[in-house]
């Protein structure tokens, strides 16, 4: 299990170890251009490619993207089917590129409602990139933060645990192998976390932008990281307890 971000004060002006993003605004991007919603999802995939490349080059260790929530199954069936097909085709065409760039791919979520073909493709993609030690790209699909916590608690019940600690829950979450996100980004103008990594975001720095996801690029990512650098991350401490180079007045 990876120690959480809240357990230690990170060093100064380095890129965040772990960035988590809610990629919001694909549908509105398409609507503004009088295009079908699916056109926004297609363009959103281009933004994913650019952000993954930028994170790799900046030295970010973990990038987690919220692609499809447990609540998204309520969307029109035509759109859901398109998103599942887009995910399948992205796995087919992008995994070799990820592998060649030493990127490890992981998929976080239930998978119970995925087709057998999609589940098999995910398994193959994870296996192919499992030995890579560069950027870890996690796609959260059919994922919800409440589901994650309940799943962890049910595992503890099945183990016969009578007293449950925070560490026990953390160890059984879907991303127990990764540090907690240092920086959370949401595009599209909404200011909520929408059932994404509820446990893990406890001490993350939150950054919201009005940019729609298809318009989010390297420059926008750099702006978010610059904002992150201006924050004073105390994790319950006082400013005076922080190393001098991490105090807000020294940033």
Curated annotation (Swiss-Prot):
Q: State its cofactor.
A: Mg(2+)
Which leading EC class covers this enzyme? Answer: transferase
What biological-process terms (Gene Ontology) are attached? polyprenol biosynthetic process
Q: Does the keyword section mention Hydrolase?
A: no
> Which of this chain's residues are annotated to bind substrate?
25-29, 37, 41, 69-71, 73, 75, 186, 192-194
Q: Name one Pfam family in it.
A: Prenyltransf
Q: Which of UniProt's keywords are assigned here?
A: Magnesium, Metal-binding, Transferase
Entry keyword annotation includes Transferase: yes
Family statement: Belongs to the UPP synthase family.
Q: What does this protein do?
A: Catalyzes the condensation of isopentenyl diphosphate (IPP) with allylic pyrophosphates generating different type of terpenoids.
Q: What is this protein called?
A: Isoprenyl transferase
Species this protein is from: Chromobacterium violaceum (strain ATCC 12472 / DSM 30191 / JCM 1249 / CCUG 213 / NBRC 12614 / NCIMB 9131 / NCTC 9757 / MK)
The taxonomic lineage of its organism, from the top, reads: Bacteria, Pseudomonadati, Pseudomonadota, Betaproteobacteria, Neisseriales
């Amino acid at each position: 299990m990876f120690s959480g971000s809240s357990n230690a004060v990170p060093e100064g002006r380095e890129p965040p170890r772990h960035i988590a993003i809610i990629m919001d605004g694909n549908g509105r991007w398409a609507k503004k251009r009088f295009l079908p919603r699916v056109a926004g999802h297609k363009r959103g995939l281009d933004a994913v490619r650019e952000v993954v490349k930028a994170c790799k080059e900046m030295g970010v260790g973990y990038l987690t993207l919220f692609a499809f929530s447990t609540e998204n199954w309520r969307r029109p069936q035509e759109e859901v089917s398109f998103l599942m097909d887009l995910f399948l085709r992205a796995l087919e065409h992008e995994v070799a590129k990820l592998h060649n760039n030493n990127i490890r791919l992981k998929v976080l979520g239930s998978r119970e409602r995925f087709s057998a073909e999609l589940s098999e493709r995910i398994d193959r993609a994870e296996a192919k990139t499992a030995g890579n030690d560069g950027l870890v790209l996690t796609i959260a699909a059919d994922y919800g933060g409440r589901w994650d916590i309940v799943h962890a608690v049910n595992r503890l019940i099945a183990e016969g645990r009578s007293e449950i600690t925070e560490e026990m829950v953390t160890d059984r979450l879907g991303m127990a192998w990764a540090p907690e996100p240092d920086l959370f980004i949401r595009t599209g103008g909404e200011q909520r976390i929408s059932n994404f990594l509820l446990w893990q975001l406890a001490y993350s720095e939150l950054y919201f932008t009005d940019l729609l996801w298809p318009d989010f690029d390297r420059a926008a990512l750099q702006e978010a990281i610059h904002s992150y650098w201006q924050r004073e991350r105390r994790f319950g401490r006082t400013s005076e307890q922080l190393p001098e180079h991490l105090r807000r007045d020294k940033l």
